[in-house]
Amino acid sequence: MTQKPTLHPRNRHQGRYDFPSLIKAHPDLARFTITNPHGKPSIDFANPEAVRVFNRALLKAQYGIQHWDIPADYLCPPIPGRADYIHVAADLLAEDNAGEVPKGAQVRALDIGVGANCIYPLLGHCDYRWRFLGSDIDPVALASAKAIVQANGLSKAIALRQQNNAKLILGGLLEEDERFDLTLCNPPFHASREEATRGSQRKWKNLGKQDPKRKLPVLNFGGQNNELWCEGGEIRFVSQLVGESLQYAVQVLWFTSLVSKASNLPGIEAALKKAGVKAVRIVEMGQGQKQSRMVAWSFHDHSQRQAWNERRKSQA
């Protein structure tokens, strides 16, 4: 298992945030900037509006994304961690490409559960110029993602599609002639609404901002039900994704998913073995105190993956 305890070397968010640069890019951030107990500029990460404006400033300053917003009560993602997943996935593609990350529109990625924030397609396109298809079961989330894509003139790079069957993840989503180098997925973490609420309250307490009058804490602990939990939790979702991926074994080079709970790995590895995959990779990722990992699998052996890369190069 490869160890990646800190941010990926290519991650743009190394070290402390440069608040003067962020405020210059998005002046509205100034009214949310505070001084933390260490005397450094920061924001109140328990304030959802502050987090939203902070993300907007980060995307403007670091990625040139001029327009970004999400509806209230939708997941507001921590961008450095989301960027790490993109870079770790890029390393996966480089593995069969002589160590070089493939870039450009010839590389196509599928973001399963793109969400209202559309964050993975934005980061993946900005860093590597990949083309994306983002799927979701939530029409409100897709409408928000579409507004972001259109406002930034990215319609040729990022397409969106609704998964009309809420019981399926991949099933019925892709056309027979579509090919994807990569799939991405940040699955629902919890197994029930109650578990999601308890998890949010723990994070709220850790921030020292517990408020008994609130029904649910805010911040990037917010989110719609389908963003936070599903029946059976993370292990059931990822295991279902593994099972459904078999149907698209020829059409996708690498399937990947984040897995937050290390205790879920044995069950997921059993599902991968049952599916008969040809290759598996597990890469540990860490941002601050949060640990996660990317699980990747392919139904193509090494020579088949190299042949896929050669075909892609010939189309450039």
UniProtKB/Swiss-Prot annotation:
Localization terms from the record: Cytoplasm
Keyword field: Cytoplasm, Methyltransferase, rRNA processing, S-adenosyl-L-methionine, Transferase
InterPro entries: METTL16/RlmF, rRNA_lsu_MeTfrase_F, SAM-dependent_MTases_sf
Entry's Gene Ontology BP terms: rRNA base methylation
Catalyzed reactions: adenosine(1618) in 23S rRNA + S-adenosyl-L-methionine = N(6)-methyladenosine(1618) in 23S rRNA + S-adenosyl-L-homocysteine + H(+)
EC identifiers of the protein: 2.1.1.181
Role description: Specifically methylates the adenine in position 1618 of 23S rRNA.
Family the entry assigns: Belongs to the methyltransferase superfamily. METTL16/RlmF family.
Protein name per UniProt: Ribosomal RNA large subunit methyltransferase F
Species whose genome carries this gene: Pseudomonas putida (strain W619)
